[in-house]
Design a protein with these regions (language model features):
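Acetyl-CoA-dependent GNAT
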Residues: 2, 9-80, 84-97
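Short acidic/polar active-site loop segments enriched in Thr and Asp
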Residues: 100
Length: 101
């Protein structure tokens, strides 16, 4: 089976999965409350490998400048290039939104 990477915008009903991944990936993970705020203020993306949530990222935009606020890949999927794919997706989204930096 070929691995298929897909992206979609994060939704509030994703937060249980997002917070669980964060807690395994980081010693100081973002909280559910931070993600709830991020959903209304920033672009939050989910990354799937086949049908499995393997990562997520958050970007903010100020005028024409983008900032990467968070990026996470599931521990058991790290070292496979997925972080780079997620970063490239987030950079492409920022560019599509008019960001030049």
């Amino acid at each position: 089976m070929t691995d298929c990477v897909q992206f979609r915008l994060m939704q509030a009903d994703d937060l249980d999965r997002v917070v669980a991944l964060e807690q395994h990936a980081f010693s100081h993970p973002w909280t559910r409350a931070l993600y709830l705020d991020a959903l209304t203020s920033y672009e939050c993306w989910m990354m799937y490998l086949d049908d499995q949530h393997v990562g997520h990222g958050v970007i903010s935009q100020i005028v024409d400048e983008a900032h990467l606020l968070n990026i996470a890949i599931a521990v058991n999927h790290q070292g496979k290039g997925l972080g780079l794919q997620l970063l490239e997706h987030l950079m492409q989204r920022a560019s599509q939104r008019g960001c030049v930096e």
